[in-house]
Amino acid sequence: MREGKRGPPCILSFRGTLERVEAQWELEAQGPGQCPAPLGDPASTTDGAQEARVPLDGAFWIPRPPAGSPKGCFACVSKPPALQAPAAPAPEPSASPPMAPTLFPMESKSSKTDSVRAAGAPPACKHLAEKKTMTNPTTVIEVYPDTTEVNDYYLWSIFNFVYLNFCCLGFIALAYSLKVRDKKLLNDLNGAVEDAKTARLFNITSSALAASCIILVFIFLRYPLTDY
């Protein structure tokens, strides 16, 4: 038999317009100088049977969005397709042999259902996640300082007003003591402290001046002016 010479391999490439498909395959001619007919023309039948076509090598396809109503909030659905997040590709089936069963420690039912739900559920909308993470409005309780420690000098003011009311200083001290009580009821700690200091000052002044007058009176009574 005469063996024919094998010519150079012919490369047939095409570019599809649907879904931006780009593919290229190689076909080897059966006889010398023969190439397969272009796409759409009938192939030559005089050269014998041709080899089977090699499947597309290097072709890639853009997955179409799944049919059905889109899931998510209105803000996510209303976005144009270009701005929406691409769907995660489905995992390819692996041809590896089945693995031996592995034993794991027992888990609670709630944690198991949560892990299965997190692994199999599609990614939730970020707007829904933000709504779920929003906390309820908290009630603010104002804690006022303890005003019972503020001394109003009320008894001291009454004593000075009744017995040692020198130049009405005891009356003024009593008025400030009453103001301290009112501000303690209103939870005004700063005002109560200031009025308490003022009442104390007037009580000290009234007591000192009244005591000085009493001492002078006793001195003049013990040593009258006629002795000098």
Swiss-Prot record:
- Output the superkingdom of the source species: Eukaryota
Q: Lipid modification S-palmitoyl cysteine sits where?
A: C167, C168
Q: Which GO terms describe its cellular component?
A: plasma membrane
Membrane-traversing stretches? 155-175, 201-221
A Pfam family found in this protein is CD225
Positions on the Extracellular side per record topology: 1-154, 222-228
Topological domains on the Cytoplasmic side lie at 176-200
Give membrane topology per the record. Answer: Multi-pass membrane protein
Subcellular localization(s) per the UniProt record: Cell membrane
Q: Which UniProt keywords apply?
A: Cell membrane, Lipoprotein, Membrane, Palmitate, Transmembrane, Transmembrane helix
Residue ranges of the region described as Disordered: 29-49
Q: Does the keyword Cell membrane apply?
A: yes
Q: Which family does it belong to?
A: Belongs to the CD225/Dispanin family.
Q: What protein name applies here?
A: Interferon-induced transmembrane protein 10
UniProt lists the gene as IFITM10
